[in-house]
Curated annotation (Swiss-Prot):
Motif annotated as 'KMSKS' region, chain positions: 533-537
Residues involved in ATP binding: K536
Gene this chain is encoded by: valS
Cellular location(s): Cytoplasm
A biological-process GO annotation: valyl-tRNA aminoacylation
Family: Belongs to the class-I aminoacyl-tRNA synthetase family. ValS type 1 subfamily.
Its EC number(s): 6.1.1.9
Annotated source species: Porphyromonas gingivalis (strain ATCC 33277 / DSM 20709 / CIP 103683 / JCM 12257 / NCTC 11834 / 2561)
UniProt protein name: Valine--tRNA ligase
Amino acid sequence: MEIASKYNPEEVESKWYNYWMEYGCFISVPDGRKPYTVVIPPPNVTGVLHMGHMLNNTIQDILVRRARMKGYNACWVPGTDHASIATEAKVVGRLAAQGISKQDLGREEFLRHAWDWTHEHGGIILEQLKRLGASCDWTRTAFTMDESRSESVIKVFVDLYNKGLIYRGIRVVNWDPKALTALSDEEVIYKETNGKLYYLRYFVENEPDKYIIVATTRPETIMGDTAVCVNPNDERYRWLRGKRVIVPTVGRAVPIIEDEYVDMEFGTGCLKVTPAHDVNDYMLGQKHRLESIDIFHDNGILNEHGGPYAGMDRFDVRKKIEQDLIDAGLMERVENYVNKVGYSERTDVPIEPKLSMQWFLQMESLAKSALDAVMNDEIKLHPAKFKNTYRHWMENVKDWCISRQLWWGHRIPAYYLPDGSIVVAETAEKAVELARKQTGSDSLTAEDLRQDSDSLDTWFSSWLWPISVFGDVMDPENEELDYYYPTSDLVTAPDILFFWVARMIMAGYEYRGKKPFDNVYLTGIVRDGQGRKMSKSLGNSPDPIMLMEKYGADGVRMGLMMAAPAGNDVLFDESLSEQGRNFCNKIWNAFRLVKGWQQAETATQPEASALAVKWFGYRLDEVKTELDDLFSKYRLSEALTLVYKLFWDDFSSWYLEMVKPAYGQPMDAKTYGSTIGFFDQLLRLLHPFMPFITEELWHALASRHDGETIMLCLLPDAHETDRDFLQAFDRTREIIAAIRNIRTGKNVPFKEKLTLEAGNEHDASFDAVIIKMGNLEAINRVEEKTSGSTSFLIGTLEYAIPMGALIDVEEEIKKLSDELAYQEKFLASVMKKLGNESFVAKAPQAVIELEQKKKSDAEARIATLRDSLNQLQSTK
């Protein structure tokens, strides 16, 4: 295979992705191998690729590709989420641009438009993932609203309802006035907001000269007040017992109630109770049997209970009522106040706590197994620091509001009979059967039943994802589930740890009796170089497709992963992608160098080459072992850095230089074969991180058959290394580096040969390497170094290079004097520590021994430096 002079990512990437698809390299079917399973966190069907997707899916692809190369039957299931709120908002917006409202169309026609939108946009992000190199089994692509997933969702709803875990009731919910739907607590984002604290006068009924002051941040809700609450232990308000007060502007008398829920230190210690518009007030209202007055329409406009403010927007009312209260003498004062306000995650408008009839799922009984699994490490979170967050959520779990006032989504399978009673069934036909049994009336037909108009929360389908992607959740004989479930690793963001991860764990134990996955890898947030979260509004989020066009997919993957420690935020800068592209070029050029060497079958292997081959073989095995350890701990960023340094430093900068034949000379066949073998192993280690360039070069490395691919090659096994040999070689590299530094410092060109003088303690095993890499005439053993030579220390051993007229004696004396002063100061600090009786008495023996070694090493260096200085000064 011909190799181009320059790496062209665009050409290489399209070629090999098509090749992988053509030969079905990503496809997984159950067989005798151990499975490795990952399900993609399904992106919104309306979405396009952003940097968070890039990070998440790069990590998944690395894990999946490495598992394939470890011999597992790797199955990565892709798919998309129907995203009820987001998709419905997009479709409503498109229709509005045409002057059409959702209500004008009706449900069925609106859903046709929604499906058209989904088919038009649903495949975009999946195609973009292919550009990244995602090795998903695309034959398994799932959609949370496709037929199979929908059947499972409806069956699970019916099952949970029949178990008594799903119920319908009136509760205060988080209401989105823009999307016109209820939200779960997890769909509300709290933001610090600059607001005001209003101190209002509530006059005592029939006592016009007496009033109490009530502090509130929401004066627009006073029309819904049905009580004022004080703490029974608050002496200030004992006189109010049994009395009633008048709600300002409304004129309605409401009772004073007492409850220890009230914080005596907040505001004035008097709390206005508005049961229909605050979850805590609702609980007080239930406890004290208060009336609930809902003053808002669904869109945030005040209804007929709003009195003179009916028909006005809630925030306009806040401004108007403030002035009206001031004018009426009912406002004591107004203070600036920073408050945490709940916003809809999807529409970014302040939510409205609102009394509403909704469907709920009881969570407490489901949560126990899910909590125990994580706390007992049956399911491991990486990093483990998120266990405390998880525990806090699960120990304070609330019932899940699962109904949404939307048309796009799984319609709730509840049917209302003419008498108002309910039946829940998988289909309308089954609902009729149930209704007939329930009522004893065989004359009931489907026309007599009315299906609930609400849809299920999107997460109600997503929580079944690790099960439903393999077929019917309720099928106990599901062979695919038996093989692939539980899945191996889940890669996701910490912000949906409860939203999604915890709920999947609950569903796993409820419907399979098993955990849904073994490990959860929690990524960080991708931020810019200034630490800001990437967002469209800030304009600091690069287009991933443009990045890949500029730097190549492998370059961008590498740039992201180099800065992505598990659980910590990623500070991404475009220069990281440039670094990734440069590494691709380094690999490419190293390959071209190696393939450009000629072989001589009969040539004898030089000693330096034999040592280099032995060293790099051991070093490679050492890295393989480290990689296994890092992957087991999900430290992928460190794993990539390790392989990067192995290739760039150890292989390219050292090994290739050590074995490189003289200009115009061939290489012996033994060294060449070893070098090609090393390159093959390096490409395999790099492949999970950089799939495209490694596939291209692996095919160029040797003749391959159609359908062969590096991704199905096994990773090379690690063998035992000789650590003494590696340590000795590290000292050899230090000697070579010191020689090079002297050449640079003295401006001695590399082509000019030097002589190295060493003492008798020097290990001559690697002299052939030192002579070649340092371009030396010889290495001489001497009792005393040549006068006027330049010396250096490796550990406690001194080496010298006779420089003759090349050396500046005064400059060398100054350099050695500075080093001597540093070593003497260092020795003094060690001596002081060892002379401290308290330190010696308390420090572990190993620490004391380390300090004693520092002392002896420093003393040896000082003696050597003094000797070198004396010799130099004698030449002056």
